[in-house]
Amino acid sequence: MIPKLPLSAFIICLNEEAYLGKCIESLERCAEIVIVDSGSTDGTAALVQSYIDAGWPIRFMYEPWRGYAGQKQFALEQCSQPWCFNIDADERLDKALRELLPELLAASDEIVGWRVARRPYLIGYGYTPENVRERRNLRLIRRGKGRYDLSQKVHEGIVPEGNVGNARTGSLLHFRPLVMDEQILKENKYSTLKADQQVESGKRPRFYKLIFTPPIYFLRLYFRNGLWRCGLSGFIEAMTGAVYAFLTAAKIYQRHALKARPNVDDALSH
């Protein structure tokens, strides 16, 4: 029996039967696994129950959808261990990160959390190599030392109450190979959430952002982050990021334009 660590992993999910099993199996050292489902209609519940029946320390519960940040905050509040780790259903800890966990949890009191590297799976290539840099995300937090910003509709993250460090090795492996048809639907959804969030916070459209942000986004991902190392698959990934940046900026502009100008029917009535 592998000794358990004082760690709660928390996962939000909806119809994740195809991915959740691998995620759970990478959390074998966690003393607790909290899974919050928002109404799955596939075999997610049966899959989770099979792990519970096999003795996994899983707490499975239903909670109506609160938005990404709200749902993760609810899941975080259910955790009972001294440390809490957020992981998505389509992610799993690689071997190096699993082996590093005891060291991270033994950090001095001044460290309240850890940022972790993430390596996505690219169709036609595989997982990006470790020298391809993706922004590290704060995933590991001491219980009671961080909360989600509920104003964030997408790309939500934990706001820590103290110092955080970067895990020196190991990665979260992100496996959800979406073909371009599916990827565009995802980018459209996320850019809508981001644009709505920006407009609600008072963000105004900027001409230069609409023109320059998409190519700058591509160049940053492809050259600075190193996606050029992944061949054509890396090019597609970087270009998809640029599309997301363009859609977000364009939607911010159009939302403001519709508020500032009368619609066609109003103009014709005068």
UniProtKB/Swiss-Prot annotation:
Record family assignment: Belongs to the glycosyltransferase 2 family. WaaE/KdtX subfamily.
GO BP: any one term: lipopolysaccharide core region biosynthetic process
Entry GO MF terms: glycosyltransferase activity
Keyword terms of this UniProt record: Glycosyltransferase, Lipopolysaccharide biosynthesis, Transferase
E.C. no: 2.4.-.-
Pathway in which the depicted protein is active: Bacterial outer membrane biogenesis; LPS core biosynthesis
PANTHER family xref list: GLYCOSYLTRANSFERASE, POLY-BETA-1,6-N-ACETYL-D-GLUCOSAMINE SYNTHASE
This protein's encoding gene: lpsC
Pfam families found in the cross-reference section: Glycos_transf_2 (PF00535)
Keyword Nuclease: no
First-tier enzyme category under EC: transferase
Organism: Rhizobium meliloti (strain 1021) (Ensifer meliloti)
Name of the protein: Lipopolysaccharide core biosynthesis glycosyltransferase LpsC
Source organism phylogeny: Bacteria, Pseudomonadati, Pseudomonadota, Alphaproteobacteria, Hyphomicrobiales
